[in-house]
Structures are given as structure tokens and as C-alpha cells.
Amino acid sequence: MINMRKSHPLLKIINHSLIDLPTPSNISVWWNFGSLLGVCLGLQILTGLFLAMHYTSDTLTAFSSVTHICRDVNYGWIIRYLHANGASMFFICLFLHVGRGMYYGSYNYLETWNIGVILLFTVMATAFMGYVLPWGQMSFWGATVITNLLSAIPYVGTSLVEWIWGGFSVDKATLTRFFAFHFILPFIITALVIVHLLFLHETGSNNPTGLNSDADKIPFHPYYTIKDILGFIIMFLFLMILVLFSPDMLGDPDNYTPANPLNTPPHIKPEWYFLFAYAILRSIPNKLGGVLALILSILILILLPMLHTSAQRSLMFRPISQCLFWILVADLFTLTWIGGQPVEHPFIIIGQLASILYFLIILVMMPLAGILENKIMKI
């Protein structure tokens, strides 16, 4: 009798994706983040579903319903904080996953990479809309400021903003539609993840050397299933420490004040995972220029395959490019810090310099370093 997992139409797909998948024998812990992202997505959908059972998307009761979840619903507090801090874990894994792709040249798998960039945009949009739902001060003003950026679009900007708001300000209509989109988008993300994996399994995984690994592959199960489970345990350990000991560490205290359109918080800022892009947006005095820079800060990832000039795929054996990569990482940390600071001296100039350096490294310095390394190899 033929093994059922190899013959059954449905089990066959799972078998080819998770069990008998030929995987390079030398992939490191940096390849764990894909599976961790899958677990994060599952956790967010599950906790989000239970939160949606008790949440009301009305401006008068939204804030109270979140309080009710935390105080009166059985284990509501842990569901709420797992969802809020699960988003932070999601973005930590997401940034490390993208960073891995940049370091080891995984962007040369064009379809997989481009779907990944679309996924990044979709997850960011979902997280932004989720941040609006508790209807605290930062939720309301964050929604007002970020959606208002669309008014910078020439000619149609103002109409577009009012169309998104469903009125002349962020109000009940905005909250209701944001809740609807926040609920549906994770399922669209799940579909995109399947497409992402489909394209990845067409080419097979990259590996740290960036070389062809067809000659040395091992089955995904049991080797990498065990490795992934270890990753899950470590991630859940960190998540539970965060949820049980300091659940509000990554949040904003202003969000514990109900939304008030008549009172602007002294410093409006998004969640920590958007601060780098927010710093780039604020570093340009012109509104339209800032919005374009904000979009380009993520969209620039699509250009990476075109900016690849090196004869080698990975940065593993390229010391000059390695230095630039880690300067870029430090620059992103700087931008994240600046995004959380008030708009005053010296933070303005630091933010502007960090923003220039961000684009300069990716668009100019990395491609030049690749050309230089090619020449050094020929000496």
C-alpha cells in the first residue's frame, strides 16, 4: 500500500511543503523566521477572533468594550495582551526575516520577494487599522494624522481623505470600516502567504553561502520541524514574559485616555514598529515629499534585485558590503529612536541625516561596494 501522505490529493500538498520538502542542509537559525511568522499570524487570527466577539465598533462604546474585555471577560486580559504584543512579535520576526533576505541575497527569487514586499505592506496596513480600534487618544489622533497624509496627493487628495473617513473627520464611519478591514485583511494575508510559499517551493530555499545546494539537501521533517519547534518555544517564552510581566511596555500611555477630538496629545506617534518610517516622513519639511519618502522607504525593497551588482549572491564573503549592511541596521535603530522623539533640535537634524543615509546606503553605496568587491576578486 502506497503511503497515504504521498497519494492523497490534500495530504500530498502538505507532504511536499512540510515533510518531504528537499531543504539545504546548511540553513541557519535565520531561516526560522518564516515559520515563526506563520505561528504569529495564526495566533493573531485566533486571538483577534475572540476579541471581535466582545468588541463593538462604535465611537461611544469602543473604548468601554476593550475595558470590558480586560475586566469582565474570562481571560479577556490575556487574549487582549497576546493580540497587542503578538503584533510586536510579528513585526520583530518580519524585520528579521526581511533583513535575512537582504543579507543573504534571497531577493534574487523575484516572485517570492515581490509577494513578500506586498505582504509587508498589507501587514503594516492591518496593524495600523488595528491600532485605531481601542479608540484611545493615540488611536484617534494617529488615525487622523496618518490618513490626512493622503491629502498631499494633488487634485484628488482631499476628496480621497473624506472618502476614507466617511465624513469630514475621523468618526463612527471610520471606526466601523477600519474594524471591517482589520478583520478581513488577515485572511487576505493568509492567501498571500500561500502564494509566497508556492513561489518559494518552485525555486527551493536559498542558503547562507548563496550557492546552489541541489547536491546537498535533506528532508524538511524531522530535521527542520524540530528546529522550528525550538524557535516556537523561544518565541512564546519571550511573548509570555512580555504579556505577563510588562504588557504595556510597548504601548502608549495616551491610549488609556478615551479619544477626544478637542484635545490633541503633545506628541502624536504610531506604534514602535512604524517609528523608522515615521521618522523618514517627518524629516522632510514638504508634505508630499514626506509621504513619497515614507512609501519609498518600504517600496525600495522591490528595487534590491536591480541594485544587485556583485558576482556573489550572499554577503557572507563580502566584508565591505557587510559593513554597509550593519551600518544600515544601526541607521534603522537610530530612525526608530528619532521617530519617538519630539520635533525639536537636535532630533530634527539627526532624523534628516539618518534618512539621507538610509537611502544613500541602499541606492548608491551597496551597488558600488558590489562593483568594488568584483574588482578586488579579480586582482
From Swiss-Prot:
Binding, heme b b562: 83, 182
Topology within the bilayer: Multi-pass membrane protein
Quaternary context: The cytochrome bc1 complex contains 11 subunits: 3 respiratory subunits (MT-CYB, CYC1 and UQCRFS1), 2 core proteins (UQCRC1 and UQCRC2) and 6 low-molecular weight proteins (UQCRH/QCR6, UQCRB/QCR7, UQCRQ/QCR8, UQCR10/QCR9, UQCR11/QCR10 and a cleavage product of UQCRFS1). This cytochrome bc1 complex then forms a dimer.
SUPFAM superfamilies associated with the record: a domain/subunit of cytochrome bc1 complex (Ubiquinol-cytochrome c reductase), Transmembrane di-heme cytochromes
Official protein name in the record: Cytochrome b
GO cellular component assignments: mitochondrial inner membrane; respiratory chain complex III
Organism (species): Eospalax fontanierii cansus (Gansu zokor)
Cofactor comment text: Binds 2 heme b groups non-covalently.
Any GO MF annotation of the entry: metal ion binding
InterPro entries with a match to the protein in the record: Cyt_b/b6_C (IPR005798), Cyt_b/b6_C_sf (IPR036150), Cyt_b/b6_N (IPR005797), Cytb/b6-like_sf (IPR027387), Cytochrome_b (IPR030689), Cytochrome_b_C_euk/bac (IPR048260), Cytochrome_b_N_euk/bac (IPR048259), Di-haem_cyt_TM (IPR016174)
Residues that coordinate or bind heme b b566: 97, 196
Transmembrane segments: 33-53, 77-98, 113-133, 178-198, 226-246, 288-308, 320-340, 347-367
Function statement: Component of the ubiquinol-cytochrome c reductase complex (complex III or cytochrome b-c1 complex) that is part of the mitochondrial respiratory chain. The b-c1 complex mediates electron transfer from ubiquinol to cytochrome c. Contributes to the generation of a proton gradient across the mitochondrial membrane that is then used for ATP synthesis.
Note: Heme 1 (or BL or b562) is low-potential and absorbs at about 562 nm, and heme 2 (or BH or b566) is high-potential and absorbs at about 566 nm.
This protein's UniProt keywords: Electron transport, Heme, Iron, Membrane, Metal-binding, Mitochondrion, Mitochondrion inner membrane, Respiratory chain, Transmembrane, Transmembrane helix, Transport, Ubiquinone
Record CDD domains: cytochrome_b_C, Cytochrome_b_N
